[in-house]
From Swiss-Prot:
Keywords in alphabetical order: DNA-binding, Plasmid, Transcription, Transcription regulation
Keyword Transcription regulation: yes
Organism: Rhizobium meliloti (strain 1021) (Ensifer meliloti)
Domains as described in the record: Lacks the C2H3-type zinc-finger found in all members of this family.
Highest taxon of the lineage: Bacteria
Entry protein name: Putative MucR family transcriptional regulatory protein RA0938
Family, per entry: Belongs to the ros/MucR family.
Single biological process term from Gene Ontology: regulation of DNA-templated transcription
Signal sequence range: none
InterPro entries according to UniProt: ROS/MUCR_sf, ROS_MUCR
GO molecular function, one term: DNA binding
């Protein structure tokens, strides 16, 4: 919703409009009356913090009412969600060199970061969603071995000698 500053219009100017909306709601159905009341309140709250041109007020009211109308359709049920199928067979998702993401079929050496950034999932949530065992790896075997060797070569994992 664009913010305009040429002429000032505050929430006090809405009294007339709010009363007009309330009068009209008496002849309409109860749900339309509720939407009109909510529209009046939302627009009033918006105008108490924002300044718009007077000629933009009808557009603001129309957009607000339309948004409420879209979100409160009577008796609408959400479409049935089809159970998601893995992008590759689970048995083929783990190899020595890479792990295949069951969400999108992409290959990774380490899957944890991809799951977190792209899907907002933890490894445990991923395992639960796809009904994987708790020991299902998130890192390719060869990559884990390579990292382990590198860490040992750097001296990690050994206790430090006291001086």
């Amino acid at each position: 919703m664009p913010s305009f500053r040429p002429k000032y219009l505050h929430s006090a100017s809405l009294d007339f409009i709010g009363n007009r909306l309330r009068r009209r709601s008496l002849t309409e159905t109860r749900s339309n009356g509720r939407r009109l009341e909510l529209t009046s309140r939302i627009v009033s709250a918006y105008l108490s913090r924002n300044v718009i041109a007077p000629d933009e007020l009808p557009y603001l009211i129309q957009q607000t009412y339309g948004s409420l109308n879209e979100t409160s359709g009577p008796g609408e049920t959400p479409p049935a969600v089809e159970e998601q199928r893995p992008a590759v067979p689970i048995k083929k998702s783990v190899t020595d060199d890479f792990i295949v993401c069951l969400e999108d079929g992409k290959k990774f050496k380490s899957l944890k970061r991809h799951l977190t950034t792209k899907y907002g999932m933890t490894p445990d949530q991923y395992r639960e969603k796809w009904k994987l065992p708790s020991e299902y790896p998130m890192t390719a075997r060869n990559y884990a071995l390579q990292r382990s060797k590198l860490a040992r070569a750097m001296g990690l994992g050994k206790s430090r000698a006291l001086k």
